[in-house]
Amino acid sequence: MHRKGGQTLRLYTHFLLHLSPHHHSFLDSIWQRKMVHPSSAFHPYTRPIPTTSGHDLPVDDSLRLLLSAEALIALAQLQDASKILPSYEPVKDFSPQLLPAMTPTPIIATPSIPEQPQPLQSPSAPNEKSRRKRTTFSPEQATRLEAEYIGDSYMAREKRHLLAQSLKLSENQVKTWFQNRRAKDKRDRKSENASNHTSNSRRSSPSRKSSSDSTPTPTQATQFDMPTQIQTASPPTTADSAIFPPTSPESIIQKIEQFPSNQILPNFDILQTYLQSLSSSQIPLQFVPSTPPLFDPNMLQLYHVIFEFSQSETCSVSFQRNSASNMRSLLIFVFFATIFAVDAQYDSADSSQSEDLPDIAPESVSSEEIIEVDVNIEGSGSGDGPIIDQVHMFGILPGPGDIRKKRGILEILGRK
């Protein structure tokens, strides 16, 4: 800190300067040009600060102590600026690409030592040193080695040493040749086994295919398309043999549980139309089944259908000259037709009719509806089994609607 004319001057520098008389004259010329505005000659950090002191310093002494930014720039442009020595050394441990800000721009240009160009090294150069040279055997050597290998693939050390001397080869070369030859044989055996396995599999595949083709595919027995409540537990042939034993011509009574009609046949109109067509025709008919069909039309090839009715409690329906193989379908057909007709008549009956009906005792009311089918067999057919003469259906209906339902059956059959 220096004082001049009641002003305090602060100077901050980090450089060690060696000024020659030539430099002093240069600074004096700069100060003379700046005398018009003395404050402009100072650096912003070295401008005078007013103080109360009254001591004065000569102008020449102040010029030697003050360094402005313009003086430093001018000194850097001088030819003999090599005398300016920085007070620190550049860091050599870090590369300029990683820390560019830490490497200052050198003011002094030092002559660089030219680097000697180094020959480029290929990437495979390190491997070439460790890689062994490939030995080329002459035809005579290869023939002799092959003959010895056929005789003994695992040669003893003494014999291998003698063989190497006779062939003018080293023992390691002979040993390596035998190792490579054994590895080649191993690869050949693996490939041969794989090819044999492939050929065997190709030969066996046609036989498997032919055996699968010769196996007959079991055909599914034709079943009626009905709801889940009614399922056929055995094929028709078993049912026919059970219903019509070949040695016993006696009558067989079967009891079949009755199911709700709305779950068995939703399309009652189709069945009613079918019944009308059967009653009006006297010749065999060909039917087109609906989708899905209730029964197979081929199973109902009837020659003639006659509906018999009476005033008794028993409703009798007769079929003439029907084959035994179609009996199962006939029973199902007659059973369903009777139930649907009764339900339709019962739903449309007037409530006034129920007043004229006699009362039924409570003990006569049953918990379920049972239909008994009585089959009468007479004689035998021409190749189709016994001929069915009559099929009688007996309706036992529950509740107060007993008699009314039976009368409904008779009325419907009477209109036919």
Curated annotation (Swiss-Prot):
Keywords: DNA-binding, Homeobox, Nucleus. The keyword Isomerase does not apply. Residues 103-144, 178-247 are annotated as: Disordered. GO terms for cellular component: nucleus. It is found in: Nucleus. One of its GO terms (molecular function) is DNA binding. Residues 118-127, 219-240 have a biased composition (Polar residues). Pfam families: Homeodomain. Transmembrane segments: none annotated. Residues 130-189 bind DNA. Its main location: nucleus. SUPFAM superfamilies: Homeodomain-like. Residues 103-113, 193-218 have a biased composition (Low complexity). InterPro entries: HD, Homeobox_CS, Homeobox_TF, Homeodomain-like_sf. This is Homeobox protein ceh-62. The lineage of its organism: Eukaryota, Metazoa, Ecdysozoa, Nematoda, Chromadorea. The gene is ceh-62.
